[in-house]
Regions:
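Acidic, metal-coordinating catalytic cores used for nucleic-acid/nucleotide bond scission
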Residues: 10-15, 50, 151-155, 174-179
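Active-site metal-binding motif and surrounding structural segment of the metallo-beta-lactamase
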Residues: 1-39, 135-152, 164-168
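Active-site metal-binding loops of divalent metal-dependent hydrolases
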Residues: 10-11, 38, 76, 92-94, ...
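A short acidic, amphipathic alpha-helical/loop segment
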Residues: 18-22, 131-135, 155-163, 180-185
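Core dinuclear metal-dependent hydrolase active-site scaffold
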Residues: 1, 65-141, 200-205
C-alpha cells in the first residue's frame, strides 16, 4: 500500500496514535506527513497534561526522520491535485495568539472536490475562536461532512447553514454525541448520519 501523504490534523493522541503503527508496517509506504508545529505557550494547562502534544510531536518527527519521510510543518493552503481529486487544507497556521486554547483550535480541515462532489473532513476543529464559522464561510455547501470533534461539541448554526451537508459521518458512539449536534445537524436537516461505532468502517462512494 502506497500512501502519498498522511495528514495529522492536530496533536491529540486520538488523532495521532495509530500513525506509528502505519510507520512500522513494512507493507505500507508513506510519501510525506503534514503536521503543523507544536506551540505550547498558549495552550491551556489541562491540555498539556492530558495530551502532551510536545512529546507526540517530537516522537513523530524522530520516527519519520529515521525513515527518511519528510514532515511538512508548513502545511499548504493552496489547492493541489491527488489523482482526479482537488484537495485543500484549511486552518493551516498554528494559533499562536489566542490564550488558554486547546489543541483542537489548531486542528486543520481538508476539503476534497471531484467534479460537483465536495467532501469536508473537519478534523477536531471547534469554534471557541471562530474557526468553524470561518471554515464554513470559506468552503460553502458540501455533500458530505465528517463532523468535527466527534460530535461532542456543538457546531454553530451559522456554520451549518453554510455547509448544509447531505451526509454526515460521526466518529463516535451515538450515545456520546452532543444533544446540540443531534438537534442542530440530524433533526434540522433530516440528512443521513452515520457513526463509526454503529456502522463500522465507513467509505463514501
Amino acid at each position: 500500500i502506497d500512501l502519498e501523504f498522511v495528514a495529522v490534523t492536530h496533536l491529540h493522541s486520538g488523532h495521532v496514535g495509530g500513525l506509528e503503527t502505519l510507520l512500522d508496517d513494512g507493507d505500507i509506504t508513506i510519501g510525506k506527513i503534514y503536521l503543523k508545529p507544536f506551540i505550547g505557550t498558549n495552550l491551556a494547562q489541562w491540555d498539556k497534561c492530558v495530551h502532551d502534544g510536545d512529546a507526540l510531536y517530537q516522537s513523530l518527527n524522530k520516527k519519520a526522520q529515521s525513515m527518511n519521510i519528510p514532515v511538512i510543518d508548513c502545511v499548504p493552503d493552496e489547492p493541489f491535485a491527488l489523482g482526479n481529486w482537488a484537495l485543500r487544507f484549511f486552518n493551516t497556521e498554528p494559533d499562536s495568539y489566542h490564550k488558554n486554547i486547546c489543541e483542537n483550535d489548531n486542528s486543520f480541515a481538508l476539503l476534497a472536490e471531484q467534479g460537483c462532489r465536495r467532501i469536508l473532513l473537519a478534523g477536531d476543529m471547534i469554534n471557541d475562536t471562530g474557526d468553524l464559522v470561518r471554515l464554513a464561510n470559506a468552503v460553502g455547501r458540501v455533500d458530505a461532512l465528517k463532523v468535527p470533534c466527534h460530535g461532542e461539541r456543538a457546531v454553530p448554526q451559522e456554520a451549518l447553514d453554510k455547509l448544509r451537508p447531505d451526509t454526515l459521518i460521526i466518529t463516535n458512539r451515538l450515545a456520546e454525541i452532543s444533544d446540540d449536534v443531534l438537534v442542530g445537524i440530524m433533526s434540522a436537516f433530516g440528512r443521513r448520519a452515520y457513526s463509526t461505532s454503529d456502522s463500522g468502517g465507513i467509505a463514501l462512494t
